[in-house]
Amino acid sequence: MEISLLNIIACPLCQGQLLLQEQELVCQIDALAYPVRTNIPVLLVSEARNILVK
């Protein structure tokens, strides 16, 4: 995924900043990790993984 894309996309839930970590885009505000599949970010809340440790 192109790093310049990170400057124009945002979390679909809170419109916060997304951080690229491995093959995921992480929203630290919502504690969600959105997958990146074949260099395409999947910014669907239903596809996001909760990253909170319980």
UniProtKB/Swiss-Prot annotation:
Gene3D superfamilies: 2.20.25.10
InterPro entries named among the record's database cross-references: Trm112-like
Any one Pfam family match given in the protein's UniProt record, by short name: Trm112p
Domain of life: Bacteria
Family to which the UniProt record says this protein belongs: Belongs to the UPF0434 family.
Protein name per its UniProtKB record: UPF0434 protein BCI_0256
